[in-house]
Amino acid sequence: MTSPRSDTRPTPLLVLDVVGLTPRLLEHMPHLRALGRAGSQAALSTVLPAVTCTAQTTFLTGTLPSEHGIVANGWYFRELGDVLLWRQHNGLVSGDRLWDAARRSHPGYTVANICWWYAMGADTDITVTPRPVYYADGRKEPDCYTRPPALHDELTEKLGTFPLFHFWGPGADLVSSQWIIDATRHILRTRRPDLALAYVPHLDYDLQRYGPDGPRAFRAAAELDAALAPLLDDARAEGRTVVALSEYGITRVSRPVDINRALRRAGLLEVHTQDGMEYLDPMTSRAFAVADHQLAHVYVRRPEDLDAVRETLAELPGIERLLDDEGKKENGLDHPRSGELVALAEPDAWFTYYYWLDDARAPDFAQLVEIHRKPGYDPVELFMDPLDPYVRIKAATAIARKKLGMRYRLAVVPLDPSPIRGSHGRLPTSDDESPLILCSTPRAVSGRVAATDVKSLLLHLAGLH
């Protein structure tokens, strides 16, 4: 087969990562539904864990975590002795990226990444990714990182500062997705990249707060669809092929599982105390878990402790299965970054990161939106503490201090995980809960598309066979 001539422009693509999109939600999204009906639509077989960083990396490399190395949204960095989530450097990803393959067929192929993960340091032409300003006095202010650097001021002047506190936290809402959509429209209009990747997270918020199958979820779907409509119109007018896909479907949950507390009670997890606050001590713990929604990597320091860890977790309600070396290999998770064991939650359960046994000894970051300090994922950051009668006064005071340029602590996150009603991370058990892939091109997709086939599909749609 001959390669396309480099002087023939590939078919331009817009790839929308519509987080949490499922068949049930699509019924409330007329613009996206029309795109699939005029073009094509299929179920998408996701990867384990079905979480953002892992799924996106599989889409872009065509490989499983066992090869690309992104085993979750975060993991235990053994060489550092630290748990780190939501890193941003593309150097953590192994393998041939979509744009690498595209440029072999078409030198000069241009790519814009608007808020897909592991954007920093990637060999893309245009980058926009959340990146707060961390001041020396401890303040954190909203902002973003861009390449080329001049794009930062261009977007900020046109759209305002990247709305970080609407991207995650108690205030997370449509505002962040709207900013990303508007930034994508601006980049398509002014830069015309061959490939534009855009991440729209709106369905991640109320579906985790209130569940995926009620009026709030359906309203969120309708809101996002209306916000996407002008971008879809722009792409159609330009002759740009649109692919909309999702990383996972969010399912209803009601049972938080305190996996680290179980390990601590068994004498396997260690903490150290400073100023009356307990901190996880991963370097001395015999075992601990890095919780990520419905999957947890369980790190066991010595092989002789594996049986004790298995026995402890076998007795913990809410765990469906523990993957050992063979189980990890079966599920594409056999990578050095994975835990010695991997715990999967039952369908209606999810894992907390909590390791303290007394809330009075919780670290102060537990009640903050602190995605980089917590040794595990904390969806409760989407809420303000309903048990604190002064929570809104505290929030208003903190915001006032922030506006005055003073240090502030927005300590409003509850320590009770029970409000969470939606989660993800397991492989779906039904098509209703499965992610989707839609394409504006007829007959481009059908039946079921594997996440590992998305890369080759996009190359085909671009005309880069």
What are these regions (language model features)?
Residues 24-67, 110-112:
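Short, structured active-site-proximal loop/turn typified by the sulfatase FGly-forming signature C/S-X-P-X-R
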Residues 1-9, 463-465:
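Basic/polar N-terminal segments that are highly enriched at the extreme N-terminus
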Residues 63-211, 223, 285-290, 294-300, ...:
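His/Asp/Glu-rich, glycine-adjacent segments
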Residues 9-24, 35, 59, 102, ...:
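Beta-strand elements within well-structured catalytic alpha/beta cores of enzymes
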Residues 25-28, 123-125, 208-210, 253-257:
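A short acidic (Asp/Glu
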Residues 9, 18, 50-51, 75-91, ...:
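Secreted, luminal/periplasmic, and some membrane-associated catalytic domains
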Residues 6-8, 187-191, 424-431:
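Short glycine/proline-enriched loop/turn "hinge" motifs that connect secondary-structure elements
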Residues 383, 392-465:
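C-terminal substrate/ligand-recognition segments
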